[in-house]
Amino acid sequence: MIGLKKGRYLASTATSEGDVAAAQALRARCFGLITDADIYDDRCAHILIHRRSDSALVCCFRMMPLTGTDISLSYAAQYYELSRLETYDGKMVEMGRFCTHPDWQDPDILRVAWGAMTAYVDAEDVQLLFGCSSFAGIETADYLDAFAMLKARHLGPSHWLPRVKAPKVFNYAARLRRKPDAKKAMLRMPPLLRTYLMMGGWVSDHAVVDDEMNTLHVFTGVEIQAIPAARKRLLRAVAG
């Protein structure tokens, strides 16, 4: 169970159907959906970030514990062929449905969220954190420098790299020949993915075109042992 107080915010694990329903409602609002509930919710720990002054829910995400042998049950496995990760020797967790309330963009919210994630990973002895990192919209032309940067610096190791499964993908690693403009790439890189990369994360060599969610997304993996020591210290300082 997560119970983390930092400044104006409190991170906790959902303990009731009402807590999960509140997270689903925030997700629906953030993702522009009428509702947002799926078969994966029951398998996950839901982490909620509330504002302490009035208990307003300002951020949420979910964590699904897995191992290599059951990675095919993950949300990401709908879109990526993950058989190479079936032999991964260590505990995994899929982090998903991360969102922050559109009216609350305080950077401290993200710090507390990452502190809560760190507390969960440490408590469960997780070795691999993974998920789908999304770009808003489905126009690949908007993100060519970002994708070129991913190709140049952040592709996953070949022995773990997901294969293509989804019907619509952008094979950016094979198609792009441009040298990335680093400034433009970072400006267009989604904040969540940018944080993963700062932690030593790696990505798939293709992006999935998700028409239902109106996003492009890449599979993202963070091997906990590969996180830079200074970054680990910062995260654990927040986690308390």
Task: Show where each model-derived region lies.
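Nucleotide-cofactor and metal-assisted catalytic machinery
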Residues: 62
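Acyl-donor binding region in acyl/amide transferases
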Residues: 66-202, 207-215
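Short loop segments at secondary-structure junctions
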Residues: 52-54, 103-104, 224-227
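Short, cationic low-complexity segments
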Residues: 238-240
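Short amphipathic alpha-helix that is part of the acyltransferase structural core
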Residues: 2-59
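C-terminal "cap" of GNAT-fold acetyltransferases
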Residues: 214-227
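Long, contiguous binding/interaction regions
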Residues: 226-235
